[in-house]
Amino acid sequence: MNSTVAPASVADIRKIFLDFFASKGHTVVPSSPLVPGNDPTLMFTNSGMVQFKDVFLGTDKRSYVRAASVQACLRAGGKHNDLENVGYTARHHTFFEMLGNWSFGDYFKRDSLKWGWELLTKVYKLPADKLWATVYIDDDEAYNIWTQEIGLPPERVVRIGDNKGAKYASDNFWMMADTGPCGPCSEIFYDHGPAIAGGPPGSPEQDGDRYIEIWNHVFMQYDMQPDGSVKPLPAPCVDTGMGLERLAAILQHVHSNYEIDIFDALIKAAARETGCTDLGNKSLRVIADHIRATAFLVSDGVLPSNEGRGYVQRRIIRRAIRHGYKLGQKAPFFYKLVPDLVTLMGEAYPGLATQAERIAQVLQAEEERFFETLANGMQILDETLTGDAKVLPGDVAFKLHDTFGFPLDLSADVCRERGVEVDEAGFHAAMEKQKAQGRAAGKFRMDRALEYSGDGNDFVGYERLTEVTKIVALYADSTPVSELKAGQAGVVVLAATPFYGESGGQVGDQGAIFSDGAMFDVADTQKIKADVFGHHGVLKSGALKIGDVVTAHVNASLRAATQRNHSATHLMHKALREVLGAHVQQKGSLVNAERTRFDFAHNAPVTDEQIREVEARVNSEILSNAATQSRVMDIDAAQETGAMMLFGEKYGESVRVLDIGASRELCGGTHVARTGDIGLFKVVAESGVASGVRRIEAVTGQNALSYLQDLEDTVTQVAGTLKAPVVEINERVAGVLDHLKSLEKEIAALKGKLASAQGDELVTQAVDVKGIKVLVAMLEGADTKTLRDTMDKLKDKLKSAVIVLAAVEGDKVQIAAGVTSNSVGKVKAGELVNFVASQVGGKGGGKPDMAMAGGTEPAKLPAALASVMAWVSAKL
């Protein structure tokens, strides 16, 4: 492995590490998923050795005995939980990358330590006088290798004893478990210098930041016995791990991991999306760290949920959102960082790039969900923590968790910033109390936000949209009140109501509640209990009191549009079962005035032909104009009619059976009187939302007509551009594409001729430098292929040469570097192209004899090209 200059980027550090160990006979192994496939006891992959655990235990064998990898790791749950420190220290992260090399019964201490020293001092070029090492107190072999063979001064090799209270309980003795493979380890430290507080390893001041551990070499040479004794292993192994971010901080001459190139870019992206101008703000650090963790988790199949790994994911996402909110961002922003992350890490982790769109969708959905309650939750925190409060009560922390979706550690994060502790015992007691109440209730959990003990409402919304009725309860800020005044937001409960409360996927009605001098705008209707509807809105004028007689009026146009979509959903469900199969089951739905969104069980995308068939069946039912019928009957009788029942849904003794066309389902929603009232049905989107779950979105009535008219406008515009009748668009487009292909072939042929001609002309411009021809040139109008073709011809003609060719197209720079085979021992094309690209805002890579790069600063290209001669001369 040749020496090289200190790498300028995290990407360089990764590549150099893997290349180095590949040159030492190691097999480069890809990073394993963050969800361990071989260890159900481990929540997340937290080190490079996880994927090799079975090899060390002897239950698995590999085709190689030496391995190296760059492993994606996560520490944010369970035993290894750094979440509360992330963003507040220089080196704590949720997601991090671990550089590692392993020997499975092959080489041992001597090669491991010597290669480590070679890589750090000869390749990465760390100053040898800045490095320290620790060894286990009894490990004379490792100590002698450091002091006698490598030449590290004895005063910088520290023996660490059993500093944890028992034999082999030491920072420098590693055990996989209470019994089994174990052994001493040797850690390499970097000294940041006397300007930073802290003492050397093993000293009382070792916890400072001056001496930082960068690489741990574990030597598994013993088998720990149940009695605490050790026996030699027949085939000792090596397991090493080096934090990429820590190493990058040293190589890039910064003290904090958050100052390295990859975090610098993510912090700037977070600042862009939050509007924060202080790049040193710790909240930006949190966001930059968390986008890595959450994106990689989604990439590995971990979606936000309320349990297990999914809840860790939710906690991390919501912590990032809260820090964005703290910076003044009141709308979803976090998902917008995904493209930045893909740019930085997509090449090293291809799965990140291929799933970028899905990752952004998952994060955006979680953001939208949390932003609905974040402001209210923060208001409660602010009110509770006013004055000289020293503790956040456990019941308040639980309310934030249960009602507003605040994970406990998010509330603790806010409290820590204000010097306040959280009563965690009280929190857990409140949670256990709720669980006990839920077990006792056994059936229906009531809305905890509004306490109502009166009679149920009389729902008249199936028959009419207006009802004269009486106010029986009023609420403001979730608290019962006797009166609402103008300007107040609140909830109104009526003795009878035509408003439908959100249920079964259908949104709640909107409208107005009014009396002489009072007008209450109803923005939403939600169930407080199964038979009690709360009308949520704002009192625009006058006053409302309990006992007032009022008129309740539903917005008729919104109700009608919602009914069309709901009835169409039933017809679509029936059609999907007929077209795709009886396995189709509803998994979720949302029906409002704009569209219907229907999630269902199905393991493959619905084809265009299948969608057309579903549309045809639904529209056929609409054209039949069949009357809708509803009947209330007991559950057993409903089952005998063959009515479709949703799997997992809880039904009472009496149910409402709804017949719409050929569909028969149990449903309490509102529907059209006849199928013809739907007007028209059109599917507008089909997608996957989870493993085995598909989603169809559709529109009806006027919305369907508008959608088709928009499509027609687009088709008409395309026809106009092509100067062809609409019916001939396909034929005309095919002709244009054929003509385009023909032109592309002609252009390619011309470029080939141009490359040949330019090659002949450029040969005369080559300069002899120490016996090797060096050629640097700009090619006008060339693309990447032309650069490559010209490069190949020049290498053939010049025989022994180093060549750099460049071209500019708009604001983009393309650079090619080529080295003939007899010169690659002195000059590497990859190093050369990166040298040039780094001066024009870009980077690249390739093989030793041919490499390509791009850039974004064409104005700097002439100076960059002018510097090539001196660079090459220094290498020769």
UniProtKB/Swiss-Prot annotation:
Checking InterPro entries in the record gives: aa-tRNA-synth_II/BPL/LPL (IPR045864), Ala-tRNA-lgiase_IIc (IPR002318), Ala-tRNA-ligase_IIc_anticod-bd (IPR018162), Ala-tRNA-synth_IIc_core (IPR018165), Ala-tRNA-synth_IIc_N (IPR018164), Ala-tRNA_ligase (IPR050058), Ala_tRNA_ligase_euk/bac (IPR023033), DHHA1_dom (IPR003156)
What cofactor does its activity depend on? Zn(2+)
Q: Pull one GO CC term from this UniProt entry.
A: cytosol
Name this protein carries in UniProt? Alanine--tRNA ligase
| Species assigned in the record | Albidiferax ferrireducens (strain ATCC BAA-621 / DSM 15236 / T118) (Rhodoferax ferrireducens)
Catalytic activity line of the entry? tRNA(Ala) + L-alanine + ATP = L-alanyl-tRNA(Ala) + AMP + diphosphate
Q: Which domain of life is it from?
A: Bacteria
Q: Which UniProt keywords apply?
A: Aminoacyl-tRNA synthetase, ATP-binding, Cytoplasm, Ligase, Metal-binding, Nucleotide-binding, Protein biosynthesis, RNA-binding, tRNA-binding, Zinc
Disulfide bonding pattern of the chain: none
